[in-house]
Swiss-Prot record:
The lineage of its organism: Bacteria, Bacillati, Bacillota, Clostridia, Lachnospirales. It comes from Enterocloster bolteae (strain ATCC BAA-613 / DSM 15670 / CCUG 46953 / JCM 12243 / WAL 16351). Mn(2+) binds at residues 162, 195, 221, 256. Keywords: Cobalt, Isomerase, Manganese, Metal-binding. This is D-psicose 3-epimerase. The active site is at 162 (proton donor/acceptor), 256 (proton donor/acceptor). Optimum pH is 7.
Length: 301
């Protein structure tokens, strides 16, 4: 398993393409140009586009080669739909999820993507109008991820189990729960994914949670308590950086800010107002670059 080539080993900084958009589909080459010019190491993409937009082997190879040309590593994120749910009581929903992921993982391998993060063990957005069976759903997720991890190992793609806040998920809300979960699955290619936005709601001490995760931490999302870019809110970034240094974190640290209301993204992320006064592309670029410089300075990595 590898995230980066040996000559560029170490934690790398990235950003999710959806910071600039209101929909989950985009021209990824455009955002490769942008994030490379801004100084990032990583662009995170949505896997939904690999089913609906980038559908051919030639297109996937083209994206891979363009990323290399720009000096970028690609990472991937996904929120499964309710119809393709690894923890479902419905065998058809589980079958559809397995089919989707077993088709997706070789595509990620072809693209030289080695981390897939998100609430992969369940579905998103979660329906809280029904009585969710946490223990039963957790057991089914463990069983099905054990099977799926074999394909992940063959494709050398780490599955990052994202720890979500109580308003977006119910199976994994804390790092402690995620540790037990990934240990029970028992695969080198199933790891924990932490997100500072969610951690701010659920963790008593964010830095301690990172240290507890240790080498189980496979992926990291960065964002303020209100989804702004790092450095524009109140999170304890110096403590977070120290914890990452303490565990010698070698993965990607990907910013996942959402600042625009409207569109599918604004609706699903629950952004009900514009979060910054200037939403011009130039201003968003400026904030992203400033956040990158802030993280590199404060984290010291």
């Amino acid at each position: 398993m590898r995230y980066f080539k040996e000559e560029v080993a170490g934690m790398k900084y990235g950003i999710y393409f959806a910071y600039w958009t209101k929909e989950w589909f985009a021209d990824y080459k455009k955002y490769m140009d942008k994030v490379s010019a801004l100084g990032f190491d990583v662009l995170e993409i949505s896997c939904a586009a690999l089913r609906d937009v980038y559908t051919t082997k030639e297109q996937l190879i083209e994206l891979r080669e363009y990323a290399k040309e720009k000096g970028l590593v690609l990472t991937a994120g996904y929120g499964p739909t309710k119809a393709e749910n690894l923890c479902s009581e419905d065998p058809e929903a589980v079958r559809r999820a397995m089919t989707f992921f077993k088709d997706l993982l070789p595509k990620l391998q072809l693209m030289d993507i080695h981390i897939l993060g998100g609430g992969l063990y369940s579905y998103w957005p979660v329906d809280f109008t029904i009585n969710n069976d946490k223990q039963g759903d957790r057991a089914r997720a463990v069983r099905n991820l054990r099977e799926l991890s074999k394909t992940a190992e063959e494709c050398d793609v780490v599955l990052g189990m994202e720890v979500l806040n109580r308003y977006e998920g119910y199976i994994l809300n804390t790092c402690e729960e995620a540790i037990d979960f990934v240990d029970e699955i028992g695969s080198s290619h199933v790891k924990i994914m932490l997100d500072t936005f969610h951690m701010n709601i659920e963790e008593t001490n964010m830095a301690d949670a990172i240290r507890k995760a240790g080498d189980r931490l496979g992926h990291l999302h960065l964002g303020e308590q209100n989804r702004l870019v790092p450095g524009k809110g109140s999170l304890p970034w110096a403590e977070i950086g120290q914890a990452l240094r303490d565990i010698n974190y070698q993965g990607a640290a990907v910013m996942e800010p959402f600042v625009m209301q409207g569109g599918t993204i604004g609706s699903e992320i629950k952004v009900w107002r514009d979060m910054v006064p200037d939403l011009s592309e130039e201003a968003l670029d400026r904030d992203a670059k400033g956040a990158l410089e802030f993280c590199r300075h404060v984290f010291g990595i």
